[in-house]
Amino acid sequence: HLNFRTVRFETEALDTPNYQGNAVVNYTEREVPYTRIIEHKHFEMFGQAVYDNPKTVISREYSTEWKEGMEPYYPVNDDRNNRLADEYRALAAAERNVIFGGRLAEYKYYDMAPTIESAIRAFNAEK
């Protein structure tokens, strides 16, 4: 089977009105054990009352190895997995009346906008 990475979240409420000033901050340093911190109140949909609250909620995201029963998030980009993904793509191409798409089916990392674009392209190709 194809290998994936997954994530786990640790969420906590903090006694500060603003922890990081942004909804998402990514961390790429090897010494930092998490990949990003999400401060939920900074997503624009909540309104001023949430920003005025003297507390905030953050979630730290940790990348971890995927195991059976866990949700797969990210493909593992190495030779073995890429070769196996190519084999699966060849099998998928032989199927009729089925569209395989998204991170899992394409074995490709996608942000949301390219995911939607890929889905529209796949749909239009079936017309």
Locate the predicted segments by residue.
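C-terminal catalytic lobe of FAD-dependent flavoproteins
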Residues: 71-127
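Mid-domain catalytic core of redox enzymes
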Residues: 1-91
